[in-house]
């Protein structure tokens, strides 16, 4: 069995930065550290922080006044900052700088009177956060088919941004269609370069192997995009840890490729590789 790992796999810049900032904060405080939502979409990595005392909550109302609150890398709506100030919380803002840039663009164009269009999943925390910078008024498009069934007002001006982890091909297809539909629209390609690179690297590796293993959280958007890219080319197995590997199935393949989502720590990737090498 030959094992190859994609050139670009695992933690991206934004996640590395967020995890280090959060770890430094947890190390400094024995108690009273709260994360508003899971730090990243990887429950194994988050568990290590919770063992050190981090408390994950879903609502800011559940955080006591004067405590420390970590804003995760996905970012949050604008109103969260005001609520945190009212509660006198100390904010540790680990929002990815690329996501912060989207917040700035959306806020700026919304204040100029533009309608905001977001390409992404309305249920994803990053998109929820982005929408919160235009008073939750964004038009959110997840698929090309959805967009084709929408009606737009050509008397209005539009500004488009994208969830950082969407498929670049989806972005291009929607942009091309909207270019024909709308007279005045500003396009902002806000897909993270790490997302593009990771997907391209996974695609190249998938062409060289008999099957792919994609490691990442079940709720991780970028991991699911990697799965889609790979399964279009070869049999693909999506897992969170080595314990989910089906040994009997994998033994059928001679050349295995491995990639991992942006929220997957190196130690989980290494565990999978070691497990496969010992088969």
Curated annotation (Swiss-Prot):
The gene is ispH. Dimethylallyl diphosphate binds at residues 41, 74, 124, 220-222, 263. This is 4-hydroxy-3-methylbut-2-enyl diphosphate reductase. (2E)-4-hydroxy-3-methylbut-2-enyl diphosphate binds at residues 41, 74, 124, 164, 220-222, 263. The keyword Flavoprotein does not apply. Pathway: Isoprenoid biosynthesis; dimethylallyl diphosphate biosynthesis; dimethylallyl diphosphate from (2E)-4-hydroxy-3-methylbutenyl diphosphate: step 1/1; Isoprenoid biosynthesis; isopentenyl diphosphate biosynthesis via DXP pathway; isopentenyl diphosphate from 1-deoxy-D-xylulose 5-phosphate: step 6/6. Belongs to the IspH family. It catalyses: isopentenyl diphosphate + 2 oxidized [2Fe-2S]-[ferredoxin] + H2O = (2E)-4-hydroxy-3-methylbut-2-enyl diphosphate + 2 reduced [2Fe-2S]-[ferredoxin] + 2 H(+); dimethylallyl diphosphate + 2 oxidized [2Fe-2S]-[ferredoxin] + H2O = (2E)-4-hydroxy-3-methylbut-2-enyl diphosphate + 2 reduced [2Fe-2S]-[ferredoxin] + 2 H(+). [4Fe-4S] cluster binds at residues 12, 96, 192. The active site is at 126 (proton donor). One of its GO terms (molecular function) is 4-hydroxy-3-methylbut-2-enyl diphosphate reductase activity. It comes from Clostridioides difficile (strain 630) (Peptoclostridium difficile). Catalyzes the conversion of 1-hydroxy-2-methyl-2-(E)-butenyl 4-diphosphate (HMBPP) into a mixture of isopentenyl diphosphate (IPP) and dimethylallyl diphosphate (DMAPP). Acts in the terminal step of the DOXP/MEP pathway for isoprenoid precursor biosynthesis. Its EC number is 1.17.7.4. The keyword Cytoplasm does not apply. The lineage of its organism: Bacteria, Bacillati, Bacillota, Clostridia, Peptostreptococcales. Isopentenyl diphosphate binds at residues 41, 74, 124, 220-222, 263. Disulfide bonds: none annotated. One of its GO terms (biological process) is terpenoid biosynthetic process. Keywords: 4Fe-4S, Iron, Iron-sulfur, Isoprene biosynthesis, Metal-binding, Oxidoreductase. Its cofactor is [4Fe-4S] cluster.
């Amino acid at each position: 069995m030959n094992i190859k790992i994609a050139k670009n796999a695992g933690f991206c810049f934004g996640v590395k930065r967020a995890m280090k900032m959060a770890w430094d904060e947890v190390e400094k405080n024995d108690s009273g550290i709260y994360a508003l939502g899971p730090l990243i979409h990887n429950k194994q990595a988050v568990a290590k922080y919770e063992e050190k005392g981090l408390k994950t909550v879903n609502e800011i109302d559940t955080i006591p006044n004067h405590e420390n609150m970590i804003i995760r890398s996905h970012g949050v709506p604008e109103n969260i900052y005001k609520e945190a100030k009212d509660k006198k919380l100390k904010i540790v803002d680990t929002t990815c700088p690329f996501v912060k840039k989207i917040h700035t663009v959306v806020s700026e164009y919304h204040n100029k009177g533009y309608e905001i269009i977001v390409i992404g999943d309305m249920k994803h925390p990053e998109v929820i956060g982005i929408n919160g910078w235009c008073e939750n008024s964004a038009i959110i498009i997840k698929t090309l088919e959805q967009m084709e069934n929408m009606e737009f007002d050509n008397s209005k001006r539009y500004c488009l941004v994208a969830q950082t982890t969407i498929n670049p091909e989806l972005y291009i297809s929607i942009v091309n269609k909207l270019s024909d539909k709308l007279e005045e629209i500003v396009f902002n390609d806000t897909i993270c370069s790490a997302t593009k690179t990771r997907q391209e690297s996974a695609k190249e590796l998938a062409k060289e192997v008999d099957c792919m293993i994609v490691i990442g959280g079940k709720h991780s958007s970028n991991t699911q995009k990697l799965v889609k890219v790979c399964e279009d080319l070869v049999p693909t197995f999506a897992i969170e840890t080595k314990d989910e590997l089906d040994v009997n199935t994998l033994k059928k393949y001679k050349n295995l490729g491995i990639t991992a989502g942006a929220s997957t720590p190196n130690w989980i990737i290494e565990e999978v590789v070691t497990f496969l090498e010992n088969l």
